């Protein structure tokens, strides 16, 4: 009987212990994601796209407040409408990851800024902080943009990590007047639950594998020196009212729709939540290209007609599912 009890205790305690060790070991990788280099092939892909759309591209260098060098492109269409959209890619990606978004925005007359996030692509920076430092990076990008361009309105669009960054950036900098965010994380703790639950069973990350969540976040906070609890798009949208179009992919197992639903519930400004049927993580544009373009362009057009700084007074938007 005692032997059975010992075996039961071992079986009960082994998974949490293993999770704690795994979380501790995974911490550095969370801050130092795999870097997708900006290869010559990717540059040629972008150049071909810009040639087809008849746009002009120039290199854009911005120094962040911590002196990290951020690299990207400023791209203008043939007939610019005077509005600019800042595009933000996902984790372990680079600026070419949002090329598809840039194409339809440029065709619609929007100029775009495509930057490699810190610790991604060709940009500098010792680590990714998922919005903590990236918020001030975004403000530096806007400062540099406004020093050479006269923007009627500045909007932002991001996916995954980039979605979380744009939501936190817009809360910190009112020059960003409206945001489209696909597959954002609600906060780092919720994202860690999904990570610890093997991106399929978040309840495991909150129960049996909870020690993995705790050790991962604790080690990252010590390594990076910022409060992980404050890296929260959910808190950001509650701190400042601004228009937001949230897009979540129905079959997303990396950042399930509950993240976008939490952000939607917290948002104080005009808001819309679009659940894209059958779509996987950050795949809404691929699954429903026409509807994606229609919704995003309609959203930005609604706020392009407002006087600068007056977008929060526009009508509130609704929650939706699928096409309409």
Language model: regions and residue ranges:
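An N-terminal hydrophobic leader/cap segment in hydrolases
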Residues: 4-63
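The serine-hydrolase catalytic nucleophile loop
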Residues: 91-104, 117
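Alpha/beta-hydrolase active-site loop
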Residues: 97, 128-149
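Conserved alpha/beta-hydrolase
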Residues: 104-124
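Short beta-strand/loop motif that positions the catalytic acidic residue
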Residues: 239-241, 246-248, 252
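Conserved alpha/beta-hydrolase "acid-adjacent" motif
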Residues: 253-259
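Catalytic active-site module of serine/aspartate enzymes centered on a nucleophile-bearing elbow/loop
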Residues: 287-318, 324
